[in-house]
Amino acid sequence: MENSHLGSLTTERRNERSKRIHQAETIDMLKIMNDEDKTVAEAVQEVLPDVKTAVDYAVGSLKKGGRIIYIGAGTSGRLGVLDAAECPPTFSISPESVIGIIAGGEKALYNAVEGAEDHEAFGRRDLEAVNLSNNDTVIGIAASGRTPYVLGALKYAKKTGAKAISLTCNENSAISQAADHSIEVVVGPEVIAGSTRMKAATAHKMILNMISTAAMIKMGKVYENLMVDVKVSNDKLKERAIRIIQTVTGMPNETAAQALEMSNNQVKTAIIMLKTNEDAAAAEKLLEKSEGDIEKALSIYEKS
């Protein structure tokens, strides 16, 4: 695409409030950045209905055994990989359920890979490599809205029958036109013109957090506001798990710890055990009947 088109993008324009930032005192530089960052949450608020649709698509995919697949280049790709990586320890889901793909592969997480984002075919190839199916939801991330790699990925996703969602910071973008559904969060010019690792990336991180978290809540991975499907993989998370069990059941620390051990470190199972006075096997059956929903499991028990 032509450079003249790139220059017309909102994310590439100069920010009038930061034009003299090179002459500012350090504290004043930080105030300028902080003031600009305050506008990001407001921009995200404007697109919440669009984010809601993305959550619905994502939940639909997960319920069918499909996946949420983030794909992007550079900062956008890294954000997708980051969000995907946080889901297994937080919600005890398979690493295959939420996937992050970055143009150029793993080495691009640390260093720029020349030309990795410049070809639509590369986006298609990387989705083919993960055996994309029509049960999946693909979220293509590109602040500019014009990255060929992401454009190719979304075109292929749509052709395959997967849900194709674009996430960008410019309106009426190429990737939005290629998608089934678009989220265009317009944060305005960056403090450093074109440096979309700043406000644009912050907005995208917020939205990716929302999509994955809301999807997991709807999949029964959260009870009240507690991380009841946390994967107990270290001492800190074990302490958190025990505290969650205590909070929900009102039992003392020692009882909660024993239940966690008897449930093979499954927080939900431990909670059901203590709430119903049943053993781990019976608690697991209740959770199976309720598709992992604690409230429904307890309701089934009370009616039995």
UniProtKB/Swiss-Prot annotation:
Region listing for Disordered, in residue ranges: 1-20
Task: Give the enzyme's EC designation.
Answer: 4.2.1.126
Say if the entry is tagged with keyword Ribosomal protein: no
Source domain of life? Bacteria
Group of enzyme by EC:
lyase
> What does the UniProt keyword field contain?
Carbohydrate metabolism, Lyase
Instruction: Name the residue ranges with Polar residues bias.
Output: 1-10
A GO BP term here is: amino sugar catabolic process
* Lyase as UniProt keyword: yes
Q: Pfam families, from UniProt?
A: GKRP-like_C (PF20741), GKRP_SIS_N (PF22645)
This entry's Gene Ontology molecular function terms read: carbohydrate derivative binding; carbon-oxygen lyase activity; ether hydrolase activity
| Active site residues according to the UniProt entry | E86 (proton donor), E117
The entry assigns this protein to a family as follows:
Belongs to the GCKR-like family. MurNAc-6-P etherase subfamily.
What further note is attached to this protein's record? A lyase-type mechanism (elimination/hydration) is suggested for the cleavage of the lactyl ether bond of MurNAc 6-phosphate, with the formation of an alpha,beta-unsaturated aldehyde intermediate with (E)-stereochemistry, followed by the syn addition of water to give product.
Q: Can you name this protein?
A: N-acetylmuramic acid 6-phosphate etherase 1
User: What organism, scientifically named, is this protein from?
Assistant: Bacillus licheniformis (strain ATCC 14580 / DSM 13 / JCM 2505 / CCUG 7422 / NBRC 12200 / NCIMB 9375 / NCTC 10341 / NRRL NRS-1264 / Gibson 46)
Name of the encoding gene? murQ1
